[in-house]
Regions:
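Active-site phosphate-binding strand-loop segment of PLP-dependent enzymes
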Residues: 60-161, 165, 169, 173
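Conserved PLP-anchoring active-site segment centered on the Schiff-base-forming lysine
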Residues: 19-72
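Conserved N-terminal alpha-helix of the aminotransferase class I/II PLP-enzyme fold
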Residues: 1-14, 36
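Structural motif of enzymes handling amino- and sulfur-group chemistry
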Residues: 151-202
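Buried hydrophobic packing segments
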Residues: 15-20, 146
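Short acidic capping loops at alpha-helix termini that bridge into adjacent secondary structure
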Residues: 4-5, 27-30, 76, 157
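A short beta-strand submotif of the Rossmann-like class I SAM-dependent methyltransferase core
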Residues: 8, 33, 82
């Protein structure tokens, strides 16, 4: 991706949290997203004193419905999260235009769309920032992890500052649990075992 900075973290939910935190939004400011999200994304919004606002899912793209997005935007709307649930990148230029016209930060969640593009431009390069997951079952997996892609220097400095003051190395026990879980997933999804359980038992 042609972005100036890539931060790596333990999860995508932390990536989302720290992007939001770096924006220094006011209590009660609104973050628009679709209702098909992991609970911790909503928790990240609430933990920062912000308000989640849900927008309908577009039937074709499974991303934000543009008409409902326009209806839900108001003076308190500060962030729009565009999640590409099925790997399909919608007409993100239209979403970006709506955000630009209303001084809203657009964050892309590209966890399911690595390598996807719109008009020959890669997903993750349209918004103010992009986040992604590297957890099991994702297109690219590193046992666990998440990342932030961003260009804005002020925000990069703010995120770096927050990392230095708030994050610490994980405990060995935690890493061991993650590795054991990933080993189980790898075994259960191996060709022989997966075929046995999915074909012969059903």
């Amino acid at each position: 991706w042609e972005r100036k900075k890539c931060f790596t973290l333990s999860t995508c939910r932390l990536a989302f949290y720290y992007v939001l935190k770096s924006l220094k939004l006011k209590k009660g400011d609104e973050v628009i997203l679709t209702p098909i999200q992991i609970p911790d994304f909503v928790n990240a919004i609430l933990n920062l004193g912000l308000k989640p606002v849900f927008v309908e899912v577009d039937e074709k793209t499974k991303c934000l419905d543009l008409d409902d997005l326009k209806r839900k935007i108001n003076d308190k709307t500060k962030v729009v999260l565009a999640t590409y649930l099925t790997g399909i990148v919608p007409d993100i230029n239209k979403i970006q235009k709506i955000c630009d016209e209303n001084n809203i930060f657009l964050i892309e969640d590209i966890s399911q769309s690595y390598g996807s593009s719109h008009n020959f431009k890669k997903a993750g390069t349209f918004g103010f920032a992009a986040i992604g997951s590297l957890s099991p079952a994702k297109i690219i997996s590193s046992v666990g992890g998440g990342f932030i892609l961003i260009d804005d220097k002020k925000t990069i400095d703010e995120i770096s500052h927050n990392f230095e003051n708030e994050l610490s190395l994980p405990e060995k026990k935690t890493l061991l649990k993650i590795c054991i879980f990933q080993l189980k997933v790898s075994l259960l999804t191996s060709t022989i075992i997966f075929n046995f359980f999915s074909f012969y038992l059903f």
